[in-house]
C-alpha cells in the first residue's frame, strides 16, 4: 500500500524518536551555536596559525567538510578534514591548529588524532558535548567549546558547522560571516515553512522530490563549495532512510562517471540523479551542469536540480542541507523505517569493543 505523506498521524508512528523536531530545529541550532562561539575560550596565540585540520567522523566530521568549502571561497588559510586514526605526517607544530570534533566526546578515531596532535605540539580546540575528549581538554587546559543538544551527531549539524564557522571567524581566517549567519537563520525559517509535514505534497517540494526518489538508487551531484552538501544528502539517505545512495562532484565526474551512465542496463531504470546547484558556480561549471543533464537524458536516467537559497555561500549551503534533510525524512516515511536508530553502526562498535 502506498504511503500518504499528507497523512498527519503517519509521522509519530515511524518516528518515535522525533527526528522531525531536530530537523525543524536547524535555524535555532545555527543561531544558538553562533552565540556560543562568540563567548567560547580562544587564546590570542591561536590566531597565529597557518593551517587548520578538523578531526572527526560521521556527523561530527561533515561540519568540517562544509567549512572547507566556505574556506576555499573566502578563507585565508588551508583547511582539511581528517577521518581516521592517523594524522598526516606534515601536521605538526604550534602554527597548525587541530580541532577535535566529536559530539559524544568518545569517538575513538578522534581521540587518537587528538593524542597525536598534542604529541606534535599543535594548537588544539575541542568541540564536543562532553565525554573523554572534554575530560582531556580540561586536564590539559585546552580551549573547550561545548554545546548541549540531545540528538544524534547528524541531527546536530547546525552546531557542528556553525561552531566551526564561528571559530574560523574569531581566528580571523574567514570573513563576512556575521551578516551571513543572520541571513541564513531567516532563510532557513522561510524555507522550512514550505517543507513541513502539514504542507501537502502538491505544494511541498521536499515531499515531491521524495516521491521521485521512492524505490530508486539516488546519486547526488555537487560542485565547489557545495561538494560536501552532496555528501550530506547521501549520508542522510543512508542513516535516516536506511538505503543505498551515492554522491559525486563536478567537474571531476565529467572526466570519468559520465562514461558509465548507460550500464548496466538492468540498473539504469532504478537510478535518479539530483543536482545540487548554486548561482555562484563557476561559469564553466554552469555549462557542464547542462551538458551533464543532456547526457543523463540520452541514457534514460532521470535528473532533477535544486538550488541553494540566499546570497551568501553559507546561506545557500545550509538551505540545501535543510531541504535535503526533509527529503530524507520523507523517503524514510516511504520506506517505513525509523530514522533515528543506526543498528549497523552500533553492531560495528560492539564488535570493535571486543578486540580493544
What are these regions (language model features)?
Residues 258-343:
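C-terminal active-site/capping subdomain that shapes the small-molecule cofactor and substrate pocket
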Residues 82-83, 243-254, 302-311:
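A generic structural motif
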Residues 15-22, 29, 37-41, 47-50, ...:
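Active-site phosphate/pyrophosphate-binding segments
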Residues 340-356:
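Short, small/acidic-rich helices and loops at N termini and domain boundaries
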Amino acid at each position: 500500500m502506498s504511503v500518504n505523506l499528507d497523512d498527519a498521524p503517519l509521522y509519530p508512528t515511524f518516528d518515535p524518536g522525533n527526528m522531525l523536531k531536530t530537523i525543524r530545529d536547524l535555524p535555532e541550532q545555527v543561531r544558538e551555536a553562533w552565540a556560543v562561539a562568540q563567548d567560547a575560550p580562544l587564546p590570542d596565540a591561536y590566531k597565529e596559525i597557518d593551517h587548520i585540520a578538523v578531526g572527526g567522523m560521521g556527523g561530527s566530521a561533515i561540519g568540517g567538510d562544509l567549512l572547507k568549502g566556505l574556506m576555499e571561497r573566502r578563507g585565508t588559510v588551508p583547511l582539511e578534514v581528517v577521518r581516521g586514526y592517523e594524522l598526516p605526517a606534515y601536521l605538526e607544530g604550534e602554527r597548525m591548529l587541530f580541532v577535535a570534533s566529536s559530539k559524544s566526546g568518545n569517538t575513538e578515531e578522534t581521540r587518537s588524532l587528538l593524542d597525536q596532535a598534542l604529541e606534535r605540539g599543535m594548537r588544539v580546540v575541542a568541540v564536543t558535548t562532553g565525554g573523554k575528549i572534554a575530560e582531556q581538554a580540561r586536564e590539559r587546559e585546552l580551549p573547550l567549546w561545548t554545546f548541549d543538544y540531545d540528538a544524534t551527531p547528524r541531527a546536530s549539524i547546525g552546531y557542528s558547522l556553525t561552531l566551526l564557522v564561528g571559530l574560523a571567524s574569531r581566528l580571523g581566517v574567514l570573513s563576512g560571516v556575521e551578516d551571513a549567519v543572520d541571513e541564513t537563520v531567516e532563510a532557513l525559517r522561510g524555507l522550512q515553512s514550505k517543507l513541513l509535514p502539514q504542507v501537502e505534497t502538491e505544494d511541498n517540494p521536499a515531499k515531491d522530490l521524495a516521491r521521485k526518489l521512492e524505490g530508486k538508487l539516488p546519486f547526488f551531484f555537487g560542485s565547489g563549495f557545495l561538494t560536501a552538501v552532496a555528501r550530506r544528502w547521501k549520508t542522510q539517505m543512508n542513516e535516516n532512510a536506511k538505503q543505498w545512495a551515492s554522491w559525486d562532484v563536478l567537474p571531476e565526474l565529467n572526466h570519468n562517471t559520465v562514461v558509465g551512465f548507460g550500464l548496466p542496463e538492468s540498473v539504469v531504470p532504478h537510478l535518479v540523479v539530483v543536482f545540487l546547484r548554486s548561482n555562484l558556480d563557476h561559469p564553466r561549471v554552469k555549462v557542464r551542469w547542462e551538458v551533464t543533464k543532456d547526457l543523463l537524458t540520452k541514457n534514460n536516467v532521470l535528473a532533477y536540480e535544486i538550488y541553494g537559497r540566499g546570497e551568501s555561500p553559507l546561506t545557500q549551503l545550509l538551505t540545501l542541507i535543510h531541504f535535503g534533510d526533509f527529503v530524507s525524512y520523507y523517503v524514510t516515511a516511504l520506506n517505513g523505517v525509523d530514522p533515528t536508530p543506526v543498528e549497523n553502526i552500533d553492531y560495528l562498535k560492539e564488535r570493535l569493543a571486543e578486540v580493544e
